[in-house]
Amino acid sequence: DKRNYFENIFSKLIESTLIDLHSETPNDLHTIIPIASFAGNNCLSDNIHTPISSLDNLTNLPSHQISDLNLWKGIAELILTKNGDVRKTVNKSIGFPADQKKIKLNFSELLETLSAHRIFLQKLHEVRDLPDPLFSDNEWKVLRATLLLLPNMADTLRNIFSEQGKTDFTEISLAAREALGTE
């Protein structure tokens, strides 16, 4: 059915992004595993609602598989500020109680090391905005309605371009590509 079709497309696009992220993952990121698990456990036990909580049982770095999307989001939340910069402060709000100085120091040192890996950090920040590959019933209703309306919307846009004497070069390019075939 169409819903499964579009969910599969979403999954492939998300996995493609995760593959890009995985290819840029620095070798020293593996040292985050016990730190992330520690932070995740503390966030869970302190009832702090954050993606970091998903890291509570982390034993390996996440893979590029869609099933690990939430783990990557947890790592992004742990490492990055909302703006995508590397965290400067390590505190209780991300799972590090004040009395845990050793692990806080280890994490601060790792953050300093990771700050040199700009491409990885950029891709990690992008992961935060990736959607869940499965549509909720409401999301599916909106998407299905949009798909039904798209042909009418395209016709309306063509009419507007025609009335205003404008040229839609993108549509011309797509039509030419369709006419020539894909070889």
Predicted regions: what they are:
Residues 165-176:
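Conserved pre-motif I regulatory segment
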Residues 175-183:
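Conserved RecA-like ASCE ATPase "motif II neighborhood" in helicase/translocase motors
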